[in-house]
Amino acid sequence: MPAKQKRLIHHWITFTSRKIVLIDEAHNPCRTMMLPMALKGLVSQAEGSNADVAIFHALCASAAYNLFELSARSNEQDRVLALYHDNEAVHHLRHNLARANEHRDQSFAMAIMACIAVEAVSGTTQRWRTHVSGGLAYLTQLQSQGLPEVALSAFRQHMVKMAIMCGFPVPDNLKAFLDDESGASDGLEFTFPYYGVSRSFLRAHDRINSFLTDSEEIRTAEQEKELDTFELQLYLDFPGLPPQAAPSATAISRNSIVIHHTSTAFYYAGLVFFQRSVRHAPVAAVQDLVELGVQELESIDQVGKGALGCLMLWPVLVLGAECGGPALQQRMRIWFQAQRRLGFRNLVVLEDLVATVWRARTVAGANEADAHWRRFIAQAQYDVFRL
């Protein structure tokens, strides 16, 4: 087993950890934090279960699933290894969840993140929801213990962003940092791993989630006026230009350009999502916005020249599913094909979902409301982690 694990960790270090996020930087926590914790887990696993052991198995599982996908799902040995380490990671995570109040470091929070990474790489459906719910519950517990802000901030930002983007309700006390006007939370779009996701975007998306929760209610004239104001704010909140880098700092400059294109892709996807899901606009009415968003996705790849990792997939899902004509749909097919080099199964499942939405709209007499990606992604076969 050690020789097989060594191969998996080698792949994690050289490929998976670098591709699981859009931009691989020197401070990538997938290496700087997870690897030391995984080492502790490897050394201590004979003594019993702990969060570090869960991290070790999660890294091995992610790497094995990644290798299996990169082999076009032909290497059965990698699949068997992936399932073994996946089961071990979940076993140790659950065991330590029962002792969550005993944890005094970041290892359990990182174990949750490592297991969510497994779900993304493997494309396993539905189970990711348990990890996100558990992460929010653990965050609530940590915050109630009055821990120092420095111990909470990174995990809170990570979990709250993830939950909002995945449509989870988040308690007000956990997302209060989004309304912080002191400037401490500015520039979120430049931080790992949610490149391109600004504080204002998260606030707006959280509000859209609440609109969708209340969608069955008949709005009053005052509520319609508030909705009009909110819609106008969405349109006006165009992403600003990234900070100017020194002319010689080529990599930094490239990363800033990539982040700007990513922010703009989120901007257009957010408008499309609002129009289609809250305003119930027809597909034809959002095609200008969709095309602009697809251009941003293409620009990210052009700037990255094949060296980037995986973009957060929410704008891809929204923009891809709302492509209304064959030309735009073909551009999205090409985009998805280019991402297969990453070996992440959730991309494959979302590509299939998008194509299913397109086909559903071509059926004679099809209701556009029924052929919405939100209806399809609720089905077990498509409910993958979409970030």
Residue positions per predicted region:
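Residue-level signal for threonine
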Residues: 105, 198, 344
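Extended C-terminal subregions enriched in glycine
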Residues: 306-310
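Residue-level recognition of the N-termini of beta-strands and the immediately preceding loop/turn
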Residues: 106-107, 156, 348-351
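Hydrophobic/aromatic-rich effector regions of fungal transcription factors
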Residues: 36-46, 58-75, 84-125, 135-141, ...
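Acidic, Ser/Thr/Pro-rich intrinsically disordered transcriptional activation regions
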Residues: 1-58, 62, 69-78, 243-247, ...
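Short coil/turn linker motifs that delimit alpha-helical repeat modules in TPR/alpha-solenoid proteins
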Residues: 52, 104, 152, 258-260, ...
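Central/C-terminal regulatory/activation regions of fungal transcription factors
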Residues: 3-35, 79, 120-293, 377-387
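Short alpha-helical linear motifs
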Residues: 132-136, 179-180, 313-316, 354-362, ...
